[in-house]
């Protein structure tokens, strides 16, 4: 007999301990995936009216949420909810950390956010010449300071003033 079996006796389903009373208990097991924050990366345009919401997936529902630089943005989070709203204040990178406080040794989920002004614009036209007095559709693509293309949802706050010089 090994040492572990000597220390804690085991009983089969048919054996009893003869305690003089029944021992009954219940155990509820709930399997929960580790918390996850989506998206893992987002670049947002620096504008005081801009807000971006991260989604918290899985986990117990009770989280500790933090950002690594409150000078760059404000974090809006209500305990028990599954969304984190970020309001930018200054340009720069932020790390958003979400830890499940109900699950011991759970993995911390991290998302990165870049708050950026437009670093570069690309203008695409179907042709190179336009006749005087006519019009042409152009496509403008904006990139952040690290060269990432802004997602479509960020263009609503950008005011492009494109001037054309006719020679």
Locate predicted features.
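Extracytoplasmic soluble-region selector
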Residues: 1-167
């Amino acid at each position: 007999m090994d040492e572990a079996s000597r220390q804690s006796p085991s009983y089969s389903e048919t054996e009893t301990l003869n305690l003089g009373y029944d021992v009954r208990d219940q155990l509820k097991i709930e399997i929960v995936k580790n918390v996850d924050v989506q998206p893992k990366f987002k670049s947002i345009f620096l504008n005081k009216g801009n807000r971006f919401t991260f989604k918290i997936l899985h986990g117990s529902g009770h989280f500790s949420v933090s950002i690594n630089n409150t000078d760059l943005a404000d974090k809006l989070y209500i305990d028990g909810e599954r969304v984190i709203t970020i309001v930018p204040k200054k340009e720069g990178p932020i790390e958003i950390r979400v830890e499940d406080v109900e699950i011991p040794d759970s993995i911390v989920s991290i998302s990165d956010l870049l708050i950026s002004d437009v670093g570069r614009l690309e203008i695409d036209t179907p042709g190179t010449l336009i006749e005087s007095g006519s019009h042409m559709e152009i496509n403008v693509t904006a990139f952040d300071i690290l060269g990432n293309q802004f997602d479509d949802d960020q263009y609503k706050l950008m005011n492009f003033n494109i001037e054309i010089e006719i020679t």
